[in-house]
């Protein structure tokens, strides 16, 4: 049994769940006490801090810090999952200009309350929304 204490910053690859990453770290290190600081959707990539040993006690401190996200988007397509991985259910020509985008971007900066889409890792009654959506 390993007795490591600290934080590993893992660049979570696409198609791995946060739990998958924890399982790999557990298998590679033999560490029993592990945690992470917030679930990333399986199709999301990015830094996933993995806490080992006594560092798991700092989880709340890390979770309560500001986070930032970078997003890419495509205008003119609608999918059944509201993301790029779904089946395209509609298309339209986009007449939005770069200037129009630059004017509205400030509306998406700062603290924003968002209703998560059904295809997300958010849990309801102990189940991931993306699992419920696929049923």
Question: Where are the regions that the model predicts?
Answer:
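Catalytic/RNA-binding core of pseudouridine synthases
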Residues: 1-135
């Amino acid at each position: 049994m390993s007795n490591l204490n600290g934080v590993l910053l893992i660049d979570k690859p696409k198609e791995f769940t946060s739990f998958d990453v924890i399982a790999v770290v557990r298998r590679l290190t033999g560490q029993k006490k592990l945690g992470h600081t917030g679930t990333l959707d399986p199709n999301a990539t990015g830094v996933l801090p993995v806490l080992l040993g006594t560092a798991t006690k700092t989880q709340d401190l890390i979770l309560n810090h500001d986070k930032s996200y970078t997003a890419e988007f495509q205008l003119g397509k609608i999918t059944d999952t509201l993301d790029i991985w779904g089946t395209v259910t509609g298309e339209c020509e986009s007449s939005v200009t770069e200037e129009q985008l630059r004017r509205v971007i400030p509306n998406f900066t700062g603290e924003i309350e968002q209703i998560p889409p059904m295809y997300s890792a958010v849990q309801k009654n102990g189940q991931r929304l993306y699992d419920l959506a696929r049923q």
